[in-house]
Design a protein with these regions (language model features):
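Short, glycine/acidic-enriched loop or turn micro-motifs at the edges of active sites
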Residues: 53-55, 106-107, 128
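Conserved beta-strand -> loop -> alpha-helix junction used to position metal-binding or nucleic-acid-contacting
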Residues: 118-135, 141-147
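Conserved beta-strand scaffold positions in the cores of enzyme catalytic domains, especially
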Residues: 75-77, 100, 121-125
Length: 389
């Protein structure tokens, strides 16, 4: 509230200190077993559950640990390396007989079911509950909502500070950093607080279901849709690997032929002779010089963000009415985009069964339609190109 913000700025509200009493972690099998036994004995109405993984897809990664809270006052992070058969059996019973609260259930359930075979007959999703009241894309993440709706906002900062320092010290970029590089003592507080905050968000958001219309949408569309899309993602999208490889080769042949056609244009040959180097069709600087300075085409007036004359598709299409070079460049770009964006991207990401497993999202649009993201946005596949078909 406004009053709380003012009070915090004035120093009247102290920072919440997160310690072992609130967020604990264990790599000890007996400590983990005792906590799970206590949860089973308590027979809670619901349990918040989260996973930490070293990948975004169950087939491409494994689970590092799980975090749980059944009070909202404290949580635990358990390293999966300390699991034994008894712990897995007890967790299976706990999840099967308790309402389980996730934040982004589709992600977590996929890992739990794929790697452990756990079942979740009764689950809820705080991310989808929030989407019910705010359909704008973005802003549904656990960290953003925890900052807004719980006393524990920014609990992830120490861990992300460590990650930034580690990447700088070891020369790693975001793509090369793996979640399992994070030491247990750094991870445990962050992970346990994920579960605590998920629990607290559910306590706040579950009141949304007092509205019968919103409850119907949630119970009959969002939750069943979450399960359906999780299964669809697990099934994957089938591709014929051999046909993709053939198409990749055909497209490269088309690109090479289009480039050769461009290099045969007299104006391009003369430009290369004058410049003393080969013309690179991917260089916008060379392209501007060729089109506007050497050939003498009139700029359309459209500018880039830096104020230079634009050579985007719209401009090339317009200039193509006056000269062949813009048409040839546009043709090369279109073919290269299809090859680079789709064919080159799909083939290395196919699983052994020749299926691509990407994401389908319920909460990604304001209109309520599905969206796709991840390895490949399936909604952006061009429909009219014969090679793609």
């Amino acid at each position: 509230s406004k009053e709380n913000i003012i009070a915090y700025i004035n120093g009247e509200i102290e920072d919440v200190i997160i310690d072992e009493k609130i967020a604990m972690g264990t790599q000890d099998t007996e400590v983990a077993r005792a906590w799970i036994d206590a949860a089973l004995a308590a027979k809670p109405e619901y349990l918040a559950l989260d996973s930490e993984t070293n990948g975004l897809y169950p087939r491409n990664g494994h689970m590092i640990g799980i975090s749980m809270s059944y009070t909202g006052k404290d949580g635990i992070y358990i390293d999966t390396d300390c699991f034994d058969e008894d712990i897995e059996e007890k967790l299976g019973r706990l999840f099967k007989n308790t309402k389980v609260i996730f934040h982004n259930a589709k992600f977590d359930m996929a890992f739990f079911e794929y790697h452990f075979g756990f079942e979740f007959p009764d689950f809820e999703d705080t991310m989808l509950l929030h989407y019910l009241i705010d359909e704008n894309p973005g802003g549904h993440g656990l960290k953003e909502l925890s900052l807004k709706f719980t006393p524990y906002g920014d609990y992830e900062k120490p861990m992300y500070d460590w990650i930034d320092q580690y990447k700088r010290s070891n020369g790693l970029n975001q793509e090369s950093f793996q979640w399992d590089m994070i030491p247990f003592d750094i991870m445990k507080t962050y992970a346990a607080m994920d579960a605590v905050c998920t629990y607290l968000l559910y306590e706040k958001f579950v009141k949304i279901k007092q509205n019968p219309k919103l409850k119907w949408v949630y119970d009959h569309i969002l939750i069943p849709g979450c399960r359906f899309l999780m299964d669809a993602q697990d099934n994957g999208v089938p591709f014929d690997r051999m046909r993709l490889l053939v198409s990749q080769g055909l497209m490269q042949d088309d690109i090479d032929a289009a480039i050769n056609q461009l290099y045969e244009v007299e104006a391009v040959r003369e430009f290369e002779k004058a410049q003393g180097k080969d013309f690179n069709p991917n260089s916008t600087v060379q392209l501007r010089s060729l089109l506007f300075d050497y050939i003498g085409l009139q700029p359309t007036g459209k500018k880039t963000g830096t104020g230079a004359n634009s050579t985007d598709a719209e401009v090339l299409q317009q200039l193509g009415e006056e000269h062949d070079v813009p048409k040839f460049i546009l043709n090369i770009r279109q073919k290269s985009k299809i090859k680079n964006t789709y064919l080159d991207k799909i083939i290395p990401q196919l699983d052994r069964d020749s299926r691509l497993r990407t994401n389908f999202n319920l909460h990604g649009t304001t209109s309520g339609r599905l969206s796709s993201s991840g390895k490949l946005n399936m909604q952006q596949l061009p429909r009219d190109n014969p090679i793609v078909k």
